Each structure stands twice: as structure tokens, then as C-alpha cells.
Swiss-Prot record:
Domain of life the protein comes from: Eukaryota
Protein name (record): MSDIN-like toxin proprotein 3
Lineage: Eukaryota, Fungi, Dikarya, Basidiomycota, Agaricomycotina
InterPro entries (UniProt xref): Amanitin/phalloidin
Species of origin: Amanita exitialis
Family of this protein: Belongs to the MSDIN fungal toxin family.
Keyword set, alphabetical order: Toxin
Known role: Probable toxin that belongs to the MSDIN-like toxin family responsible for a large number of food poisoning cases and deaths.
């Protein structure tokens, strides 16, 4: 089980990071507009 988690963790991080980056850009743009 631990081996599977070691493989899944990096994949989850890589799949989540781009979404978080987009959200941060949108928030920054929103703050700039307001």
C-alpha cells in the first residue's frame, strides 16, 4: 500500500498544482481590477 501512495502522491500534486496556479492568477487579476 505504501508503494502505491508514493507513486500517487506526486501525480496528485502535479494534477492539482496547475489548477491552483490558475485560481491564484484569477484572484490576482480580480484584485487588480477591483
Amino acid at each position: 500500500m505504501s508503494d502505491i501512495n508514493v507513486i500517487r502522491a506526486p501525480l496528485l500534486i502535479l494534477s492539482i498544482l496547475p489548477c491552483v496556479g490558475d485560481d491564484i492568477e484569477v484572484l490576482r487579476r480580480g484584485e487588480g481590477l477591483s
